[in-house]
Every structure is written in structure tokens, then in C-alpha cells.
Amino acid sequence: MSTTTQNIPWYRHLNRAQWRAFSAAWLGYLLDGFDFVLIALVLTEVQGEFGLTTVQAASLISAAFISRWFGGLMLGAMGDRYGRRLAMVTSIVLFSAGTLACGFAPGYITMFIARLVIGMGMAGEYGSSATYVIESWPKHLRNKASGFLISGFSVGAVVAAQVYSLVVPVWGWRALFFIGILPIIFALWLRKNIPEAEDWKEKHAGKAPVRTMVDILYRGEHRIANIVMTLAAATALWFCFAGNLQNAAIVAVLGLLCAAIFISFMVQSTGKRWPTGVMLMVVVLFAFLYSWPIQALLPTYLKTDLAYNPHTVANVLFFSGFGAAVGCCVGGFLGDWLGTRKAYVCSLLASQLLIIPVFAIGGANVWVLGLLLFFQQMLGQGIAGILPKLIGGYFDTDQRAAGLGFTYNVGALGGALAPIIGALIAQRLDLGTALASLSFSLTFVVILLIGLDMPSRVQRWLRPEALRTHDAIDGKPFSGAVPFGSAKNDLVKTKS
């Protein structure tokens, strides 16, 4: 940027069309967050009505994560082939329909299936909205684009918590799911009036349709084998998370089977750059493992361990959700200032100072607990707002929506594991101790994976001929693309 450009406030670098595009995507993400967290808010009520065990109840949260990998793949490929807008609209219809079905669910299995539908829609929303906004904004503002967008999910969670305190005590838990579908008409109308992402239009102008991840996996020479593997992965995940299997050894074998299938899909779709894709899935897996025990089971902790009433639970969740939303925006500024990876590491390190106090002070002082949660979630959860920017930078425009959608949502299976692991540990420890220990220990793993830029580093070790040296979104060099002690300035920029 020139000196003159740098002196202009960042928000003046955006035109009206870019703001309208962001507003539409942000609203969709708010609705996504609203619909997705409803089950966490009413988990104890659903558990009581359906007569579920704690692990079965937690699996209803996990169900949405089980289907996310397939939703990210299919809807991401739709976004790569037909544009980001169509994928966004399809996604929002899916997760809204799933939310309505939850309200009518007569029992556990029906609600589990409805949550699978929500997961597919959520996955498509994440990949398509993130790529849409990031590709619509100027390169030097793309951490802000990512962070601001993801804040919508946390705002949706805050709104859901407030609606929960007003609706559930009067009309019951089913009414909450019926409300979740009402704003969808406005969102769909708004999305019909937004332009396509600039990067996608430039890449596809006058060119033949790209070969998407769906084309490679399900229309190529290995399509039969890939269809069989898809069904095998879906079946294995169903048995792992539907609360039917109690044998840990069988669950471990099925988990390894799924991992092998997902790695196979990544190798087929990314070719020589498969080490990068696999390591990105690992990064996201641990990102969910450290954050989602708190996200999923905090309402249960407040209601059971601290014996808070619905109104107090809503107030505490407001601080938590609002902190995460603010953190997404702060993370966007930090990312554009320090760089994506450095901002991520600094924010997570700061969050570690707060995680133990959050669960150590008990419930005597609601306001102190709320403030601690606000800052812990701002630093620990909010920084995940720039995760789409981090992941998307490893993929070209032609593969970005499916690459981001599949990679992120396979890794998001950590979010399916997290509440179940938390619930299992809580059978031997109190729930607060279980949540604090999981989050504190696994956050350090994420700090190492991102701080050392392990996707680029492992790519350099295993397939150096396909190493990407610079971020495909903002053009900045990857630290892991050079050995320790070498200068990043020596990197030669690769073609996108």
C-alpha cells in the first residue's frame, strides 16, 4: 500500500457492495450460531424428556459435527463450481430445516438425524460465507473480514441464550427450535441481492468449469471405492457418536478407519500438497478439542454444578458469547497487524492465564465469573475468527471453498469428541475440573501447531516440490516454508 492509502481509515477502503456482501454473510452466520447452540441450551430439558444418559445427551451436540465433513465437501464444491452465493443459500436452508425438525422430534433418533442435517448446513455456511467475504474484501483487510464474519456466530449464541431465558420457562424447549427458523426469510431475500465474490469471478471469467473435489472423488476413476468409503465413514461415525457403543477399543478402531478415509480423500483431491491438507485437519481437530468442551457443556456446568436458574445462566452465557464475538473482531485487527499466525499464538497464550480461575472461583459471584469468561473467551475462542483466513491461505481460489470446508469440518470432529470426552471425564471429576483441564492442556498443542506453521513445515519435509511459500490470500510468506535460522525474505513467491 502507498503512504496515502495507509493514512485512510481501514473502513473507507470498502465500498457499499463489499459492506452489503459482508452484512448478508454475517447475518447468515448469526442465524447459524443461533440455530446451532440451541441444543446446548436445552440439553438438560431434552435429556429429561427423552430419558437419555449424559453421554447420549452429549452425542446430540456431537451429531452436528459428524455430518459436517460431508457438508463441507459437497457444499464447498458447489461454491467452487457455481459460485459462493448459491452455496450460502443452500446451506442456510439446510440448517434451518434441521432446526425446525428438532422442534418436532418425538425421540432421540429423530433429533439425532435432524442434528445431522444442521451439521451439513453449518459446514456449508462456514466454508461458503468465509470464502465469499474474504475474497470480496481487499487483501490487507482479510483478517478483519474473517474475524468480523465469525463474530456473527457468537452473537447468534448470545441472542439464543437471551431468547432461551424468555421462551423455555413459559413455552418449553420445543418452542425455542420453532423460533430458530423465523429469520430465514429475510436472510434468503438479502442473499438474492448480493454480488458474487470478486476473486471467484476473476478466476472463472471466460474459463471452463473447474474440476471440483466432488468431481475428483465421485466422478473419477476411483468413484466406486470413494462412495463405499463415504458410506463406511458415515456408518462408523454413527456408531461412535450415537451412544450405542460402549467398547473403547471398537470406537478407537472405527475412529482410525475414518481418519484413513479422510486422509485418502485429501490425498486424492490435493495431490502432492496432501501433507499440508492433513496437517490443517490436525490443527482444526485440536482447535475444537480445546475450545468445544467449554462451548458445549458450559450451560450444563452452570445449571448443575453451580445450580444457576435459567435467567442467571442466560446472563453468564451473554458474557461468554459476547466475549467470543468481541474476540473475533479483536483477532481481525491483530491478524492484520501482527500477521495471522503470530496473532493466534499471542492470543491463546494470554487466554491460558484465565482458564483455571474461571472454573476455580465457583458460583458465588456471578459478575466476577461473567467477566472472567468474557476475557477468557475473547482471547481463547474469539481468535478462532481468523481461522478461515489461516486455512484458506493454503488453497488456491479454484479449490478454496471445498478445501476450507472439508479440511475445517473434518477437523471439527474434535467438536464431536469434545463434549463426550468432557462428560466421560466428569464421571470421575467434577465437570468444571474436567473442562478446565481439557482446555488448558490442549490449547498448548494448538499454540505449537500454529506457531511453528506445521502445515508448511511437514509439506517441506515430505513433498518439498509442491511447497507453497506464500499465503494465497494475502501474499505473506509462510514461516514454515524455510528451515530454522533461514530468512523469510529469501523465499521466492510461488504462483497461485
Swiss-Prot record:
Record key words, sorted: Cell inner membrane, Cell membrane, Membrane, Sugar transport, Transmembrane, Transmembrane helix, Transport
Reaction(s) the record says it catalyses: N-acetylneuraminate(in) + H(+)(in) = N-acetylneuraminate(out) + H(+)(out)
Main location class: membrane
Gene3D superfamilies documented for this protein: MFS general substrate transporter like domains (1.20.1250.20)
InterPro entries for this protein: MFS, MFS_dom, MFS_trans_sf, SA_transporter
SUPFAM superfamilies the UniProt entry points to: MFS general substrate transporter
Superkingdom per UniProt: Bacteria
Cystine pairs: none
Entry-linked PANTHER family: CARBOXYLIC ACID TRANSPORTER PROTEIN HOMOLOG, SIALIC ACID TRANSPORTER NANT
Its job: Catalyzes the proton-dependent transport of sialic acid.
Protein name: Sialic acid transporter NanT
Gene name of the encoded protein: nanT
